[in-house]
């Protein structure tokens, strides 16, 4: 309930205050995970400023995942992200930032730094390192109460095909710091996301996304299942 109130407050500010949000973006996305047989809905509001600051807030809702099978719909998590762009020259940019994730288990902090390179006016490459630190403890494989902290590396490729279409690829490697395992029975896991955007109007951009999430699917007491994510969404400039 508190997370819902926080999200409502931020959305109200974004929609009602022109001084705070003059060109915000609202992103609505739905998806399905084939291994876990789970449906998701995401609502995200983001804003960038000319002075280099960027911020977003989003909520994620699942129907059956993360031991939440008794409810048809529930607000599983809310996260807030802030970063600042430092232009090194006309092609290179460094973005230090922080992601704060709220869930029923507790709060997770993810400080990161991202380096991006505009190879051409249509082609961009990026790489990011993020450290996910949990402010709460959970039982590890040895039975001890520890923090399930994670090292995360991301790679990005974005290509503007033409005035109508943009293609993006994000590859991710996760590595658990302590005595925990992913659903693939390993301390590490990978993800690959492929997105195709259609710039229907200057203010409306629908898109489709396919993700391969390694063998991280969990369903009916079984894990190590091949996990595919199929998503469709649309972004609106407000």
From Swiss-Prot:
<dbReference type="GO" id="GO:0015772">
    <property type="term" value="P:oligosaccharide transport"/>
</dbReference>
<feature type="transmembrane region">
    <location>
        <begin position="204"/>
        <end position="212"/>
    </location>
</feature>
<dbReference type="GO" id="GO:0046930">
    <property type="term" value="C:pore complex"/>
</dbReference>
<dbReference type="InterPro" id="IPR009331">
    <property type="entry name" value="Oligogalacturonate-sp_porin"/>
</dbReference>
<comment type="function">
    <text>Outer membrane channel protein allowing the entry of N-acetylneuraminic acid (Neu5Ac, the most abundant sialic acid on host cell surfaces) into the bacteria. NanC proteins form high-conductance channels which are open at low membrane potentials and which have a weak anion selectivity.</text>
</comment>
<keyword id="KW-1134">Transmembrane beta strand</keyword>
<feature type="topological domain" description="Periplasmic">
    <location>
        <begin position="237"/>
        <end position="238"/>
    </location>
</feature>
<dbReference type="GO" id="GO:0009279">
    <property type="term" value="C:cell outer membrane"/>
</dbReference>
<feature type="transmembrane region">
    <location>
        <begin position="26"/>
        <end position="32"/>
    </location>
</feature>
<feature type="topological domain" description="Periplasmic">
    <location>
        <begin position="118"/>
        <end position="122"/>
    </location>
</feature>
<keyword id="KW-0406">Ion transport</keyword>
<feature type="topological domain" description="Extracellular">
    <location>
        <begin position="174"/>
        <end position="190"/>
    </location>
</feature>
<feature type="transmembrane region">
    <location>
        <begin position="53"/>
        <end position="61"/>
    </location>
</feature>
<feature type="topological domain" description="Periplasmic">
    <location>
        <begin position="50"/>
        <end position="52"/>
    </location>
</feature>
<keyword id="KW-0812">Transmembrane</keyword>
<keyword id="KW-0626">Porin</keyword>
<comment type="subunit">
    <text>Monomer.</text>
</comment>
<feature type="signal peptide">
    <location>
        <begin position="1"/>
        <end position="23"/>
    </location>
</feature>
<dbReference type="Pfam" id="PF06178">
    <property type="entry name" value="KdgM"/>
</dbReference>
<keyword id="KW-0732">Signal</keyword>
<feature type="topological domain" description="Periplasmic">
    <location>
        <begin position="87"/>
        <end position="91"/>
    </location>
</feature>
<feature type="topological domain" description="Extracellular">
    <location>
        <begin position="33"/>
        <end position="39"/>
    </location>
</feature>
<dbReference type="InterPro" id="IPR053713">
    <property type="entry name" value="Bact_OM_Channel_sf"/>
</dbReference>
<dbReference type="GO" id="GO:0015478">
    <property type="term" value="F:oligosaccharide transporting porin activity"/>
</dbReference>
<feature type="topological domain" description="Periplasmic">
    <location>
        <begin position="24"/>
        <end position="25"/>
    </location>
</feature>
<feature type="transmembrane region">
    <location>
        <begin position="165"/>
        <end position="173"/>
    </location>
</feature>
<feature type="transmembrane region">
    <location>
        <begin position="108"/>
        <end position="117"/>
    </location>
</feature>
<feature type="transmembrane region">
    <location>
        <begin position="92"/>
        <end position="102"/>
    </location>
</feature>
<keyword id="KW-0762">Sugar transport</keyword>
<feature type="topological domain" description="Extracellular">
    <location>
        <begin position="213"/>
        <end position="228"/>
    </location>
</feature>
<comment type="similarity">
    <text>Belongs to the oligogalacturonate-specific porin KdgM (TC 1.B.35) family. NanC subfamily.</text>
</comment>
<keyword id="KW-0813">Transport</keyword>
<feature type="transmembrane region">
    <location>
        <begin position="40"/>
        <end position="49"/>
    </location>
</feature>
<feature type="transmembrane region">
    <location>
        <begin position="152"/>
        <end position="159"/>
    </location>
</feature>
<keyword id="KW-0472">Membrane</keyword>
<feature type="topological domain" description="Periplasmic">
    <location>
        <begin position="160"/>
        <end position="164"/>
    </location>
</feature>
<dbReference type="GO" id="GO:0006811">
    <property type="term" value="P:monoatomic ion transport"/>
</dbReference>
<feature type="transmembrane region">
    <location>
        <begin position="123"/>
        <end position="132"/>
    </location>
</feature>
<feature type="topological domain" description="Periplasmic">
    <location>
        <begin position="201"/>
        <end position="203"/>
    </location>
</feature>
<feature type="transmembrane region">
    <location>
        <begin position="229"/>
        <end position="236"/>
    </location>
</feature>
<feature type="transmembrane region">
    <location>
        <begin position="77"/>
        <end position="86"/>
    </location>
</feature>
<dbReference type="GO" id="GO:0015288">
    <property type="term" value="F:porin activity"/>
</dbReference>
